C-alpha cells in the first residue's frame, strides 16, 4: 500500500467527501492500523472487497488532492511558518512570550 502517513493526511483533508462506509474503512486501515481481515470481519465482507475499496478510495483521495491541492497549500503554510519562526529566533531581543504568541497565531492561520 501507499505511504500511510500521506493517505492519513488525505483522509483528514477529504474524508468528508467519502461515503460513511468508505471513510470508516479508510480510518480503520490507515489510522487504527487494522488488517484487511479484521476490517472485512467488522464489515461482514471479503478481504478482497476491503482491499479493492481501499485502493479505489486512495485513488479518489489523490484525485481530490490533485484538483483542490489542500496538502500543498498546508505544506506551504508550514514552510512559511518555520521560516518566520527561524527569523524570529535569530532576533534574541524579542520576548519569549511574543515569540510564543506569534507561533500560536501562525498555527491558527495554518489550521484555518
UniProtKB/Swiss-Prot annotation:
Pfam families per record: UPF0122
Disulfide bonding pattern of the chain: none
InterPro entries according to UniProt: RNA_pol_sigma_r3/r4-like, UPF0122, UPF0122_fam_protein, WH-like_DNA-bd_sf
NCBIfam families cross-referenced by the UniProt entry: PRK00118.2-2 (NF001072), YlxM (NF045758)
Family the entry assigns: Belongs to the UPF0122 family.
PANTHER family: UPF0122 PROTEIN CBO2450/CLC_2298, UPF0122 PROTEIN YLXM
Function: Might take part in the signal recognition particle (SRP) pathway. This is inferred from the conservation of its genetic proximity to ftsY/ffh. May be a regulatory protein.
Protein's name according to its UniProt entry: UPF0122 protein CPR_1686
Amino acid at each position: 500500500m501507499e505511504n500511510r502517513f500521506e493517505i492519513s493526511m488525505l483522509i483528514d483533508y477529504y474524508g468528508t467527501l467519502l461515503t460513511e462506509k468508505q471513510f470508516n474503512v479508510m480510518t480503520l486501515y490507515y489510522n487504527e492500523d487494522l488488517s484487511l481481515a479484521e476490517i472485512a470481519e467488522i464489515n461482514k465482507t471479503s478481504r478482497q472487497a476491503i482491499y479493492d475499496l481501499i485502493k479505489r478510495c486512495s485513488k479518489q483521495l489523490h484525485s481530490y488532492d490533485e484538483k483542490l491541492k489542500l496538502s500543498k497549500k498546508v505544506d506551504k503554510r508550514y514552510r512559511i511558518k518555520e521560516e518566520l519562526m527561524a527569523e524570529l529566533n535569530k532576533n534574541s531581543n524579542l520576548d519569549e512570550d511574543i515569540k510564543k504568541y506569534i507561533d500560536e497565531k501562525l498555527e491558527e492561520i495554518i489550521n484555518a
